[in-house]
A protein has these predicted regions:
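A near-ubiquitous, low-amplitude feature marking generic local secondary-structure context
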Residues: 8-9, 23-24, 65, 73, ...
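Non-cytosolic coordination micro-motifs
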Residues: 25-63, 89, 94-184
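Hydrophobic alpha-helical segments, principally membrane-spanning helices and signal/leader peptides
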Residues: 4-6, 54-55, 68-69, 74
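Classical Sec-dependent N-terminal signal peptides that target proteins to the secretory pathway
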Residues: 1-25
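Compositionally biased P/S/T/G-rich terminal and signal peptide-adjacent segments
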Residues: 62-84
Length: 184
């Protein structure tokens, strides 16, 4: 009797701990904001820059590669943005190019609430059309969900003040250069 009770207690405890660890799992991103893309990253993920080597790079991976416990399917991706080999931003986003099923699944919203904190989505979360910002560990995290011409645009954007400013500067410089190239 005592032996059966101990075995049942251990099984229940193990199942509880396993369930708790999976429920609180979060994506294990390639690296943290500001970290350098090293040779070991190159070996694992490939080189960042192409022929132009302008020190700006974006690489995209299926979210399931970095978030195996979150049931993200083929409609969810992670985009890493690098400036001078440093990770400047992470975007976890839903690809609704075919239909809105990724956003309608509520997976990204549930992930944001579970990992970064709850926020008010109104009476029906399916119709949430807004954003929420968290500031944590010298980073900011933005959950953004907006409806544009009947297509949901949904993402979690992670960066820091320093790298946000660098990205904004890079984009403004790119906009200045593009019209000059078109004139020639």
């Amino acid at each position: 009797m005592t032996k059966n009770f101990i075995i049942k207690t251990i099984i229940v405890l193990v199942l509880f701990l396993l369930n708790f660890s999976i429920a609180n799992a979060k994506c294990k991103f390639m690296m943290d904001i500001g970290d350098k893309y090293t040779d070991s990253h190159k070996d694992k993920y490939g080189i960042l820059y192409g022929e132009d080597d302008d020190q700006y790079a974006e690489v995209k991976f299926p979210a399931a590669d970095f978030c195996p416990n979150d049931n993200f399917d083929d409609n969810f991706f992670i985009r890493y943005t690098f400036i001078s080999d440093r990770l400047a931003a992470i975007q976890l986003f839903a690809d609704n190019s075919i239909d809105n099923s990724a956003t309608e699944s509520m997976k990204l919203m549930k992930y944001a609430k579970r990992v970064y904190g709850d926020f008010d989505t109104g009476g029906n979360p399916q119709y949430y059309n807004n954003f929420n910002i968290w500031e944590k560990f010298q980073k900011y995290i933005v959950y953004n969900r907006k409806l544009i011409e009947n297509i949901w645009d949904e993402e979690i954007y992670i960066s820091s003040d320093k790298y946000y400013e660098e990205l904004a500067l890079y984009q403004s410089m790119s906009e200045l250069i593009e019209p000059l190239e078109e004139e020639n």
